Amino acid sequence: MKYKKKNILFITTIIVIYLAFLFNWLEIGIFKPKGESISESEMLSKISRKDISESVRYSVYKTMFLKDKPFDIRNVYQIELTTHNNEKFHAEIIKNTKEELSFELLPRNKISYQYEFRPFSWLLSIFSILLNFINVLSSLVFTIYIFLAIHRESGKLNSKSLITSKQKSLFTFKDVAGNTEEKEEMTELIDFLKQPQKYETIGAAIPRGVLLEGPPGTGKTLLAKALAGEASVPFYAVSGSEFVEMYVGVGASRVRKLFKEAKLNAPCVLFIDEIDVLGGRRGGNSSGGNQEKDQTLNQLLTEMDGFTPSQGIIVIGATNRADMLDAALLRPGRFDRKILVNLPDIKSRAEILKLHAQNKKLSSDIDFHQLAQQTPGMSGAQLAAVLNEASILTVRNHKDFITMTELSEALDRVLMGPAKKSIKYDPEERRMVAYHEAGHAVIGIKLKHAQKVQKITIIPRGNAGGYNLMMPEKETFFSSRKRMLAQIQSFLGGRVAEELVFDDISSGAFDDFRQATKIARLMVTKYGMSDLGVSQDSEFSDKKLIDTAIKKIIDNCYARTKHLMLENKTLLDQIAHLLLEQETITQAEIEQLVVNTKK
């Protein structure tokens, strides 16, 4: 309602100003005389010389008041004339309203004339004065309105509603599946928020800030909410981007207001998501944006030094780019504790899937451990998306329960996108795609350190004509040279199969080459797994030597892949033929095919 009234006032003001200007424009347009303006004496001279070719028009142009005699009203007479040369002139004569103009010159010179007398109108004069007053007043009101609007918007920039982010967290650690070590690290923070005196007595200083670092979707925000929920304290959630504006000083002001509010509601948890936006390294160019960012970070550093541990404020920052943070933000006394939130392992993935499946109707054949095996490297958010997609597919298929069929399709949709069944290959293209995917599968089956095949399909998804779902035999903390070489060979398997069977190659392997080259480059420049030794890539490195070493790794892997493919040509043909028959092959069908091939 408040905004409606403001809008009505604004629109009314605009209309009044428009009408006032319109009236003035019409008045000028109607009464403005034509031609050049001349003096009264010049006009009389032209009449005397009989230079006038048309009739002369006399009219009251406007009414005026004398400054020294307010009640002495004068009419301004307008006289328009046209000469023999078709030149137009006009003149104005001021006379008292009671006086009469002398028209003796015109009849004497046999010039016809018209005289229009408009008597003085108090109503018209008052209306004219009132309209001019309204014009000035409305212009003033409009100016004030614009000024207040700018001031109000400036105030909004300066006090963006960060305080409204205060909430009571309904999450606890029971709502966070996996992340066992991370939850253990944060448990003592709960005790501090509940009983800070216990730590003060011993002289222990609880961390002022906790930095949660990890890939997107691993549950950093959820951990912060669960911490506040377990401790039953207010939870403030803001994003780092909310502090950064183009106007210098705005971000720093927001930081001050946020910490002021947090101190009034201590103990509490203050969560800053994407803190790398706010806390990135200072320096660089001296543009306005950089100055604003630096001032905001300086204010954050000051605020984190400005409250004592006894106030019970724990600042939690979340980022997936900790390497971008300013060193001053990471020193002891600010973000004292750093917790790495990794992607879930197979056990954690199974727990996450079970947690997100609690409110869903599932069939009895659901195997969460098997599904967890098929989802290596997936985050908690992606796993939640898989179950949600499965629920949607169940409704679409008019089923009452979610089955493994829907879960398998949902996994494909999350990883590769929806199936493009409308795309129809010609027989030769379809056969090439089948052999390409079969080539990847053969390497996964026959190479010792390669990832094992879970499913193969030639149904197009996203930009891929088909794909292999492969996973490592066991999850490891790091990768070895043999595993990395085997992975390169797996990527090259599709191209090798095309070359052997068709004596031709397609563009379908472009992403395979990109992935293989990426691994080879890391082996050379980062992991020291080439003939160049352990030297790191830098601006002083010999780029030609690096490229040569990468090419050598790729060429050797290609040769070994080709040799392995020739040895297992029968298995390659059988997998390709089965793919052409049913488009998708499961892990069980692949294992049975391998057994039959050995017989």
Curated annotation (Swiss-Prot):
In the central section; belongs to the AAA ATPase family. One of its GO terms (molecular function) is ATP-dependent peptidase activity. Residues 29-128 are extracellular. InterPro entries: AAA+_ATPase, AAA_lid_3, ATPase_AAA_core, ATPase_AAA_CS, FtsH, P-loop_NTPase, Peptidase_M41, Peptidase_M41-like. The gene is ftsH3. It is a multi-pass membrane protein. Its EC number is 3.4.24.-. Zn(2+) binds at H436, H440, D512. One of its GO terms (cellular component) is plasma membrane. ATP binds at G214, P215, P216, G217, T218, G219, K220, T221. It is found in: Cell membrane. This is ATP-dependent zinc metalloprotease FtsH 3. The chain crosses the membrane at residues 8-28, 129-149. Acts as a processive, ATP-dependent zinc metallopeptidase for both cytoplasmic and membrane proteins. Plays a role in the quality control of integral membrane proteins. NCBIfam families: FtsH_fam. It comes from the Bacteria. It comes from Phytoplasma mali (strain AT). The active site is at E437. It is an enzyme of class 3 (hydrolase). Its cofactor is Zn(2+).
